[in-house]
Amino acid sequence: MNTVRETIAAIATAQGRGGVGIVRLSGPLAAKAGQLITGRTLTPRHAHYGPFRDQEGLVLDEGIALFFPGPNSFTGEDVLELQGHGGPVVLDMLLQRCVQVGCRLARPGEFSERAFLNDKLDLAQAEAIADLIEASSSQAARNALRSLQGEFSKRVHSLTEALIALRIYVEAAIDFPEEEIDFLADGHVLSMLDSVRAELSTVQREAGQGALLRDGMTVVIAGRPNAGKSSLLNQLAGREAAIVTAIAGTTRDILREHIHIDGMPLHVVDTAGLRDTDDHVEKIGVERALKAIGEADRVLLVVDSTAPEASDPFALWPEFLDQRPDPGKVTLIRNKADLSGEPVGLEQCDDGHVTITLSAKGDDQGLLLLRDHLKACMGYEQTAESGFSARRRHLDALRQACAHLEHGRAQLTLAGAGELLAEDLRQAQHALGEITGAFSSDDLLGRIFSSFCIGK
C-alpha cells in the first residue's frame, strides 16, 4: 500500500495537560472524518464549534473543527484539525475515534515529511520546524524561523543556479572543441568559478554560526597545570563541577559540563594541564587534552598572569599550536588578575586572538566579559535580519561542495582538464542538493523525519 495515500492522525500538541489540545489528520479521509466526528459538512477554512462524537453518537468533547482542502494546506493534502480540551485522556479518546473512521496513527515527523514530498517545503525548511520547536534561545528561534521562511534554501538555490550556469558554459566548451576560441582558457570560467567559491565560503561561515546556535559551541579550557582552568569551569557552570586544589595535575582526564549563557548552549570541556610528565595516567590525560583542543569550536587558553612564562603563553607548549593553528578560534585568558594586579579587561590582538584578563575567583566583571565574548562567538549579536539555522549535515554538504570546487579549479588550471572540472561541478551541485532534498536517499529522509515530534 502507498502510505502517502493513507490518512494519518496524531495529537499535535505537547504531552501533558493544557487548556487546548489538537488532533491533526492529513489524507483523503480528512473531510469524511470531520463529517462523521462533528455530524456536519465542514466548510473549508472556517471554524466550526460543536461536539465531537463517538460511533454511538455520544459526545467525547466539544471544540473547534477546521478543514483545509489540499493542495492549499500544510501537507498539500486534505487536513483536518480538531481543537478540544487539552487533557491526555480526552485527546486519546478523540484520536482513537479518528482511527475508527479509517485513519492510522502517524509516524514521528510524518506530517512534515508529506509536506516535503508534496513540495510544500524543502528539506532544510522541514528541519527548521524541529529547530524552531527545540530552540534554546531567542536568537536560535529567530534563525530557525528564517530558515523555515526559506532564507537558507534561497542561498543554496542561488549557489545551485550559479553552478548550473557554469556547468552549461563548461560543457558547451567541451562539446564544441572546433571553435577557434578556447572558452576554458579565456579566464571567464575561472572568474565564474571563483565567484561561486566566494559566495559558498560566505554561506559556509553563516551556516557555521547557525549550527553553533542550534547545537551549542564546544569550548575547551586548556593551559598549564595550576593555571586556574578548573576554577574557571566552576565559575562558568555556577557550581563546583571540578575539584580545585593547589596540587599540580589534579585534573587528569576530560571533564565535560553542559551550560547555558542567556539560553545559548555551551559544551565546556576542562582538560588536564599541558606539561611533560612521566606519569602514565597524566600523560594519557594530556593526549586527550590535545585531541579535544583540535576538535573544539573555541579554546580558552588559561595562563597564570603571575608566572614568568605568561609573557609568551603560546610558546609554552608547541603541540598546542599544532592542534589549534587558527588564532581566531583562541581566547587567551590571563587568570589570577587579583594576584598580578593587571587590570581586568578584553583586548583584540593583531594576530586575531582575543585576550581577557580576569580572576577565576569571583571576578564578576571579568566573567561578564567572558560570557559576553562567548555569546558573540556564537552569533548572539546577529540582528533579526541576518542568520539562519543549520545542522551538521548541512555543514558537511557545504564542505563537500567546496572541496569539489577546489579540486575542479586545480584540474582546470594545472591540467586544462575541462571534463574533470565538469564532473566536480556536478558533484558540487549534488552536495548542495542534499541540503534541500533535491538529491537525498530514502535512508537520509527517514533518519531526519524520525527525529521529529509526532504530530509535526
UniProtKB/Swiss-Prot annotation:
It is found in: Cytoplasm. (6S)-5-formyl-5,6,7,8-tetrahydrofolate binds at residues 24, 81, 120, 456. It comes from the Bacteria. The keyword Cytoplasm applies. Residues 216-379 form the TrmE-type G domain. Its cofactor is K(+). Binds 1 potassium ion per subunit. GO terms for molecular function: GTP binding; GTPase activity; metal ion binding. It is an enzyme of class 3 (hydrolase). Its main location: cytoplasm. K(+) binds at residues 226, 245, 247, 250. Mg(2+) binds at residues 230, 251. Its EC number is 3.6.-.-. GTP binds at residues 226-231, 245-251, 270-273, 335-338. Keywords: Cytoplasm, GTP-binding, Hydrolase, Magnesium, Metal-binding, Nucleotide-binding, Potassium, tRNA processing. CDD domains: trmE, TrmE_N. Disulfide bonds: none annotated. Belongs to the TRAFAC class TrmE-Era-EngA-EngB-Septin-like GTPase superfamily. TrmE GTPase family. This is tRNA modification GTPase MnmE.
